Amino acid sequence: MKELCYGSVCSGIEAASIAWEPLGMRPAWFAEIEPFPSAVLAHRWPHVANLGDMTKLAKKVLAGEIESPDVLVWGTPCQAFSIAGLRGGLDDERGALTLKYVELANAIDDKRSESFLKPTVIVWENVPGVLSSADNAFGCFLAGLAGEDAPFEPGDRPESGKSNAFWRWDGKTGCHAPKWPQCGCIYGPQRKVAWRILDAQYFGVAQRRRRVFVVASARTDLDPATVLFEFEGVRRNIAPRRKKKEIASAIIANGAAISGESLNPCLHADMPPSMKSTKAVNAFRMAAFGEYIDDETASTVKARDFKDATDLAVFSSTGAGFWSEGHGTLRAREQESHEHLVTLAFPERMSGTQHAATKNTSPSLMAKNPTAVCYEVRNAEVAVRRLTPVECERLQGFPDGHTLIPTEKRKKVNSDELAYLRNHYPDLSEEEAAMLAADGPRYKAIGNSMAIPVMRWIGDRITKAVCRQKEGSETKERKVKPAAEFERSIFKWAGGKFGVLEQIFRYLPEGKRLIEPFVGGGAVFTNAGYQENLLNDVNADLINFYKTLQREAHSLITLAHRFFQDYNTQEGYLAVRNAFNKQVYDDLHRAAAFLFLNRHCFNGLTRYNQAGEFNVGYGKYKTPYFPLQEMEAFLGAEGRSEFVCGDFAAVIEAAGEGDVIFCDPPYEPLPNTEGFTNYSGHDFKFEEQKRLVSLLTDAHRRGAKVLITNSGAPNIRELYHDSGFRVEPLFARRSVSCKGDTRGVAHDVLGILL
């Protein structure tokens, strides 16, 4: 499978690359403006361009100056949505960058569509505070990604001054603030979007770090919900106990001892006499990343401990132990002479970050790896120290020393620091040590980054989802229905091929993908049974209908049926046609109106004048047929279909080995007849016929197989013969004509290049 490439915005020190490169993904470019993270990128990834200001990327993508990646990842500045940043939201320029991200994602999708590449997959990370930002920043972001014009809201708003499950009344501002759920998904007109809060502590790092992750895409073969969500029965995380236990609270009231249920004879919910102590362990609350305060606040029994900024450090102090009658499981000798004990717990297995607890230490609980050991306290004056930068790197899952890079700024290095560095880098000179990055920028960059294991999990699920689609797109035998079960077209369409499908399928070869440069009514791809379909037409209204039916089937079918019921009169028809030509409809209503006009106009003719206006008159049909069955067949058709609107050349130039091209262009008029070749406001003269044939022969040389239909005009037969086509007869009955006597059997031709 071709490796996935990704573009990283607000890259920081590139948690995405550390997580995704081992999965076979490749960075296309970075975008970071902060000096120190940019220096880390330049040092660790010198071969990847750092494009700097992300607000300028959309124009560069559209101009083709930079690659349009398969995946777009971004961790927007979280300060605008965090408590520490006072939640400036969209009023803060950092929060407004989130909307620039939507602009960039749209530009990437537009550029990729020009090359018939699938839309990008979007990955976004931020703090949980974004879910309750007073300006509904998250709802704006979701709407932008999904393609809606108005912000989404989490639910119905209550009356002023009241709160409910979805909104919180803020008495200071006199406004409601949203309360978005911790996970959810939205299927919008442009993209599918899913979000979920993930906590790094369940992915193998020793910190609580809850973050909102959003995955979105316009791909029809990938559902973001399947990337972020898991079935409850197969989740790897056991839900933590958050309910306060009375017995546990009583036990730890004067320090840390034992809590929990009776799991093992050596650990009881009721404290054994030998483990009683007077404040033998102190609890420290995390005030900032790597900094702790001894304020005698036991974070472990706080309800807010579930939140992000309450990591806990515990150490043994000089508490006085005592003994009472009875024997304990951890006592070495009697009376008050026993050593104070500190319990340290280690995870049984941590992918990529496992460390042994100690050597020659008897495990207290497990028969496998030592997961809990007890240490004797020798020093009565133990103090909590600040975490070192390398420990912070480990907390995020980075390799040791990831941010320890040479800089151009000299710093003072004392003897202790030099000894510490030389312990890791024995050959490091004092001058080299002085030029290494200072701790301050390292702490900031690490704290602003993402947890590697969480990003790896998301990247792995994206690559597996895409890989499954790739595996499923291998060439398989087509599933062609018998003629009696062929599905009719949704539209009445001039030159439709439903009546000649048996003749066409006799010559249509096997292949991985069907390409139709002139899809029209769609009878061929609907019944041909290919695994993939690339379908083009110059008629923008036709393509809009197909895309809308793919995206909003229920809404479109319901709305179109209402048009059929309400407007089947001369006045109603003209009112719809007038609104259609004035471009007052959105995509959904325009699609419904297009189907209505096609089924109610004279002879089902789709025709536009030079001004681009639909100009066919009312057909005066008593009960026009509503194609519900045909639309359902479209939705249930074999394979994945991608619709594009434009010149036929683009999709033909995309063809290669394994592709089958079926071409049904506007027919060349027969001699002494008046052929109409301008149904969509685009002329199709004989010069266009020659250009089309030239493109088809080029595609055949690249490995594509070609079928083309046309009239039996002598100049067409000559053109096809001279270009190497095998020409076969195609007998068709004309179904659309202003003159009834011309709706007879036509002797058309099939040009074949296999």
Curated annotation (Swiss-Prot):
The active site is at residue 78. It is an enzyme of class 2 (transferase). SUPFAM superfamilies: S-adenosyl-L-methionine-dependent methyltransferases. The keyword Cell membrane does not apply. Pfam families: DNA_methylase, MethyltransfD12. Its cofactor is Mg(2+); Ca(2+). It catalyses: a 2'-deoxyadenosine in DNA + S-adenosyl-L-methionine = an N(6)-methyl-2'-deoxyadenosine in DNA + S-adenosyl-L-homocysteine + H(+). Residues 4-469 form the SAM-dependent MTase C5-type domain. GO terms for biological process: DNA restriction-modification system; methylation; mismatch repair; symbiont-mediated evasion of host restriction-modification system; symbiont-mediated suppression of host innate immune response. Keywords: Host-virus interaction, Inhibition of host innate immune response by virus, Methyltransferase, Restriction-modification system evasion by virus, S-adenosyl-L-methionine, Transferase, Viral genome packaging, Viral immunoevasion, Viral release from host cell. GO terms for molecular function: S-adenosyl-L-methionine binding; sequence-specific DNA binding; site-specific DNA-methyltransferase (adenine-specific) activity. InterPro entries: Ade_MeTrfase_dom_2, C5_DNA_meth_AS, C5_MeTfrase, DNA_methylase_N6_adenine_CS, MeTrfase_D12, SAM-dependent_MTases_sf. Optimum pH is 8.0. Gene3D superfamilies: 3.90.120.30, Adenine-specific Methyltransferase, Domain 2, Vaccinia Virus protein VP39. Belongs to the class I-like SAM-binding methyltransferase superfamily. C5-methyltransferase family. Homodimer. This is DNA N-6-adenine-methyltransferase. It comes from Escherichia phage P1 (Bacteriophage P1).
